[in-house]
Amino acid sequence: MKRKEADNWIMSYDKNNIFAKILRGEIPCKKIYEDEFVLAFYDVNPQKKIHALVIPKGEYVNLDDFASKASEKEIAGLIKGIGIVAKKLEVSEVVKGGGYRSLVNVGKNGGQEVVHLHFHIFGGEKVGKMVS
């Protein structure tokens, strides 16, 4: 991370972050889905009965970075990928899975821990309130 102003941090992309290593095949993952735009896999430390991650294949720090730099195809591919993964996990209401939560953390105050955009997919049980 680099410092912009006092108490205001801006993250910069780290090519050695864990998701970059997974994308390069240096670290294994339990893959759920992959196409030209996204990779989806199970979280190694699940917070719910079903907990998956969907990441873009491009080098994007967070949702702000993605929204300002990604192509329309990448944006559509990510959104479509999240829907495909929800269906594959059988949590989507389309497959009568009862629903799911898609969550993305942005920046320090948003709780982002890895400097590669990633969406969490939680399901398989009631996920509770949005924020405690």
Residue ranges and their predicted role:
Residues 1-132:
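HIT superfamily nucleotide-processing domains
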